[in-house]
Amino acid sequence: MSALTIFADNGASEPLWQSTDADAIREQLNAQGVRFERWQADRELGDNPTPETVLTAYQHAIDLLVAEKGYQSWDVISMRADNPQKEALRDKFLNEHTHGEDEVRFFVEGAGLFCLHIGDKVYQVLCEKNDLISVPAGTPHWFDMGSEPHFTAIRIFDNPEGWIANFTGSPIAEAYPRLA
C-alpha cells in the first residue's frame, strides 16, 4: 500500500503527518508541485521481465506521458535481491541529489521509497505497483530501494541522456527511516 509520511527536516523523531489514503497523498504532494497518481499496472510480465517486455507492455502509458509533456527518452530500472550491484546502487541513490529535469517513475512491480526534501520538510513517499510519481526538476531528494530490493519502474526523461544526478553533499538522508 502506498504511503506518505511527512517529517520536519531537522530530524525524523516524530512524523508531522502520515497516510495510506491515495487521495490524501495526492493532495499533499500536489500542494508541493509533485505529481502522484494511481495508474494501472495490470500487464503480465513474468518473474524477471526484460526491459523490452516492460516497455512493450506499457507503451500506452509512455505514449500518454510523452504526448502530455514531450519527454524524449525512457527506460526501465528493475532491481531484485539477487543483483550483485544492489548495495552499490542503493548507496548511490541514498545520497541527496537533484536533477535538471523532472524525475518521472511509473512503478509496475514492487516498491521503493522516494524521500523529497522540500522547504523545511521531508516527504517520504512509499511508491508501489500502480504508482506514478513526478518529482519536479531541482527538488532535492533520495531514493531507497531497501536491502532486499524488488521493484520494476519505467523511467521517463526530458533529455536523451537519461538519469543525470547532481549530488548536494548533504548528509540529511542518514537521519531518516529507510526500508528494511
Curated annotation (Swiss-Prot):
<dbReference type="InterPro" id="IPR014710">
    <property type="entry name" value="RmlC-like_jellyroll"/>
</dbReference>
<keyword id="KW-0479">Metal-binding</keyword>
<dbReference type="GO" id="GO:0016151">
    <property type="term" value="F:nickel cation binding"/>
</dbReference>
<dbReference type="GO" id="GO:0019284">
    <property type="term" value="P:L-methionine salvage from S-adenosylmethionine"/>
</dbReference>
<keyword id="KW-0486">Methionine biosynthesis</keyword>
<comment type="function">
    <text>Catalyzes 2 different reactions between oxygen and the acireductone 1,2-dihydroxy-3-keto-5-methylthiopentene (DHK-MTPene) depending upon the metal bound in the active site. Fe-containing acireductone dioxygenase (Fe-ARD) produces formate and 2-keto-4-methylthiobutyrate (KMTB), the alpha-ketoacid precursor of methionine in the methionine recycle pathway. Ni-containing acireductone dioxygenase (Ni-ARD) produces methylthiopropionate, carbon monoxide and formate, and does not lie on the methionine recycle pathway.</text>
</comment>
<feature type="binding site">
    <location>
        <position position="103"/>
    </location>
    <ligand>
        <name>Ni(2+)</name>
    </ligand>
</feature>
<keyword id="KW-0560">Oxidoreductase</keyword>
<keyword id="KW-0408">Iron</keyword>
<comment type="similarity">
    <text>Belongs to the acireductone dioxygenase (ARD) family.</text>
</comment>
<feature type="site" description="Important to generate the dianion">
    <location>
        <position position="105"/>
    </location>
</feature>
<dbReference type="GO" id="GO:0005506">
    <property type="term" value="F:iron ion binding"/>
</dbReference>
<feature type="binding site">
    <location>
        <position position="99"/>
    </location>
    <ligand>
        <name>Ni(2+)</name>
    </ligand>
</feature>
<feature type="binding site">
    <location>
        <position position="97"/>
    </location>
    <ligand>
        <name>Ni(2+)</name>
    </ligand>
</feature>
<feature type="binding site">
    <location>
        <position position="141"/>
    </location>
    <ligand>
        <name>Fe(2+)</name>
    </ligand>
</feature>
<dbReference type="InterPro" id="IPR023956">
    <property type="entry name" value="ARD_bac"/>
</dbReference>
<keyword id="KW-0223">Dioxygenase</keyword>
<feature type="binding site">
    <location>
        <position position="97"/>
    </location>
    <ligand>
        <name>Fe(2+)</name>
    </ligand>
</feature>
<dbReference type="GO" id="GO:0010308">
    <property type="term" value="F:acireductone dioxygenase (Ni2+-requiring) activity"/>
</dbReference>
<feature type="binding site">
    <location>
        <position position="103"/>
    </location>
    <ligand>
        <name>Fe(2+)</name>
    </ligand>
</feature>
<dbReference type="GO" id="GO:0010309">
    <property type="term" value="F:acireductone dioxygenase [iron(II)-requiring] activity"/>
</dbReference>
<dbReference type="GO" id="GO:0019509">
    <property type="term" value="P:L-methionine salvage from methylthioadenosine"/>
</dbReference>
<protein>
    <recommendedName>
        <fullName>Acireductone dioxygenase</fullName>
        <ecNumber>1.13.11.54</ecNumber>
        <ecNumber>1.13.11.53</ecNumber>
    </recommendedName>
</protein>
<feature type="binding site">
    <location>
        <position position="99"/>
    </location>
    <ligand>
        <name>Fe(2+)</name>
    </ligand>
</feature>
<feature type="binding site">
    <location>
        <position position="141"/>
    </location>
    <ligand>
        <name>Ni(2+)</name>
    </ligand>
</feature>
<keyword id="KW-0533">Nickel</keyword>
<dbReference type="InterPro" id="IPR004313">
    <property type="entry name" value="ARD"/>
</dbReference>
<comment type="subunit">
    <text>Monomer.</text>
</comment>
<dbReference type="Pfam" id="PF03079">
    <property type="entry name" value="ARD"/>
</dbReference>
<dbReference type="InterPro" id="IPR011051">
    <property type="entry name" value="RmlC_Cupin_sf"/>
</dbReference>
<feature type="site" description="May play a role in transmitting local conformational changes">
    <location>
        <position position="102"/>
    </location>
</feature>
<keyword id="KW-0028">Amino-acid biosynthesis</keyword>
<feature type="site" description="May play a role in metal incorporation in vivo">
    <location>
        <position position="96"/>
    </location>
</feature>
<comment type="pathway">
    <text>Amino-acid biosynthesis; L-methionine biosynthesis via salvage pathway; L-methionine from S-methyl-5-thio-alpha-D-ribose 1-phosphate: step 5/6.</text>
</comment>
